[in-house]
């Protein structure tokens, strides 16, 4: 255990010498303090305490007005994703059968086929159209049912939460969303140099010359960076929690439920940039791949899923969009959905989306295993 902790400590010392990591710590600290100071408690004419912006905010436009919408949209979105997938697929299949029937009928008419040939095709098209319209009505009814169920959940939960508590939860949830972007962007750049710096000539020679197993070196470097990130994140959460608690009197412990989701996202990104750093020994390439993976790929996957849903509910069907959407959903971890999960945890919305956790865990284990195997094979 001693050598492992020594590697962890060495990673911490390396971080203190990195300008990027220090900038990340500074940005997290500045944001945490600013987020506390940017809000204030006001009293409405009827004596209700609400949370508003510190500058330009009025008691009539408190943050609590967004609580119902955020809670409902998060709840209905997660439920719709699970309950509508099957009916949407059935509707899509019915649409494809209707299209094929229409094509066969058009072809028969173009060839001026005999009536006894066209009549069965017309009957087939009519049946396919009726089937599609039935499945479409069933889907629309299910969409309304999901929306109504989410509204009932909001109506049941809302009376037990004061306006001020709602405002604090919304403010915390929004802060988590922004903090995720700040920390992920900064951490990619900060951790990208850990392994390339260790593998540089001289540094790694000293390590492997000591009685330290390579698995201890590898995990020590990885865990060291991740623990340091977690400590900085915990400090930021602590500042926001204490600051908002003292300013508002609302101590929302559920706020900390977002932390494990953020740490998991950071662990996954760190595993990727570490993998690139081990294979290429290039900090710059690790940073570039990390940003491409987190930003460009994430927006591409999210865009495909939104496009597929919009087309499906609008009555337009493109098979290739559906295939790409479903394939990308299970091929890549959904950082956007993890971010939504973190916000849902703050609002205490009773939803759990296992897909990004399952896919992300698979990626994490694969990257760490293959990265370590390559690191073990390196000849120093």
Language-model features: where?
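Short cytoplasmic-facing helical segments at TM-TM junctions of multi-pass membrane proteins
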Residues: 203-207
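Short, membrane-interfacial amphipathic segments enriched in basic
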Residues: 1-6
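Terminal transmembrane helical anchor/hairpin motif
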Residues: 39-64, 68-116, 123, 129-130, ...
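Amphipathic alpha-helical interaction/coupling elements
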Residues: 7-11
């Amino acid at each position: 255990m001693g050598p492992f902790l020594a590697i962890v400590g060495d990673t911490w010392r390396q971080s203190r010498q990195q300008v990027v990591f220090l900038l990340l710590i500074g940005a997290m600290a500045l944001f945490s303090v600013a987020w506390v100071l940017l809000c204030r408690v006001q009293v409405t004419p009827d004596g209700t305490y609400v949370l508003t912006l510190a500058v330009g905010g009025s008691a009539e436009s408190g943050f609590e007005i967004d609580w119902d919408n955020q809670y409902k949209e998060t709840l209905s979105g997660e439920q719709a994703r699970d309950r509508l997938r099957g009916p949407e697929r059935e509707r899509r299949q019915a649409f494809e059968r209707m299209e094929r029937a229409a094509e066969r009928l058009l072809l028969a008419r173009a060839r001026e086929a005999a009536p006894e040939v066209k009549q069965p095709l017309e009957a087939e098209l009519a049946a396919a159209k009726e089937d599609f319209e039935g499945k479409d009505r069933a889907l629309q009814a299910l969409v309304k049912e999901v929306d109504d169920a989410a509204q009932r959940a909001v109506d049941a939960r809302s009376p037990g939460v004061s306006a001020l508590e709602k405002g604090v939860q919304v403010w915390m949830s929004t802060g988590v969303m922004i903090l995720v972007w700040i920390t992920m962007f900064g951490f990619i750049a900060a951790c990208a140099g850990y392994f390339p710096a260790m593998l540089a000539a001289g540094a790694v020679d000293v390590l492997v010359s000591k009685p330290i197993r390579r698995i201890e070196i590898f995990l020590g470097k990885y865990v060291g960076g991740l623990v340091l990130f977690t400590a900085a994140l915990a400090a930021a959460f602590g500042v926001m929690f204490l600051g908002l608690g003292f300013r508002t009197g609302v101590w929302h412990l559920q706020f900390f439920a977002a932390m494990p989701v953020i740490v998991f996202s950071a662990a996954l990104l760190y595993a990727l940039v570490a993998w690139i750093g081990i294979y290429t020994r290039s900090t710059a390439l690790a940073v570039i791949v990390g940003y491409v993976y987190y930003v460009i790929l994430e927006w591409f996957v999210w865009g495909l899923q939104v496009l597929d849903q919009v087309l499906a509910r609008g009555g337009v069907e493109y098979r290739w969009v559906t295939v790409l959407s479903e394939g990308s959903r299970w091929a890549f971890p959904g950082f956007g959905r993890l971010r939504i999960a973190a916000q849902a945890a703050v609002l205490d919305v009773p939803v759990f989306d296992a897909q990004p956790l399952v896919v992300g865990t698979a990626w994490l284990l694969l990257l760490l295993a293959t990265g370590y195997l390559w690191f073990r094979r390196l000849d120093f």
